[in-house]
A protein has these predicted regions:
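Topology signature of small-to-medium multi-pass alpha-helical membrane proteins
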Residues: 1-152
Length: 152
């Protein structure tokens, strides 16, 4: 098997894992919000923060914002999960759609939650490492795997 195919398959597996984790996180977040447990949703997201520090009465608008975040986690996970099956075969559009969707989602996560010190390495930061690795492997395969050797 060519290295290009191995890289596409590696990227696909990484995006499947990343997508499933985000689908699940979205479902959990929306479930907390829909049950009125806004503190539980926040504690689930900012898992490095003592849950007692976020235990309070939040206005319904805050719950709506957190619920929207959960929905975003869910659909971003769905998109990257679906893209993974197309990346397996080297589909250029899927490579870029997953990179833009998952990559930008994790950039925001990194800037506001990781750098803020609000999350633990697992599962949060490791997911950023996984999406970065998925992007790098698929981009490398796409941009360098198609080069033909020049004849001397």
């Amino acid at each position: 098997m060519k290295i290009k195919n191995i890289l596409f398959k590696t990227s696909s597996v990484l995006w499947i894992l990343w997508g499933l984790v985000h689908i699940l996180a979205g479902v959990f977040t929306m479930t907390f919000v829909l049950s009125g447990d806004y503190s539980g949703a926040i504690a689930g997201i900012a898992d490095a923060v003592d849950p007692s520090l976020v235990q309070m009465d939040y206005p319904a608008a805050a719950g709506a914002v957190i619920g929207q975040h959960g929905f975003n986690l869910f659909w971003i996970g769905i998109i990257t999960f679906i893209c993974a099956f197309f990346i397996w075969r080297g589909n250029k559009n899927a490579i870029f759609l997953a990179a833009i969707t998952g990559g930008l989602a994790d950039l925001g996560y990194f800037l506001f939650l990781d750098l803020g010190g609000f999350v633990n390495f697992v599962p949060g930061t490791i997911m950023t490492v996984i999406s970065s690795a998925a992007i790098i492997t698929s981009f490398y395969a796409h941009f360098h795997g198609n080069k033909k050797k020049k004849k001397a």
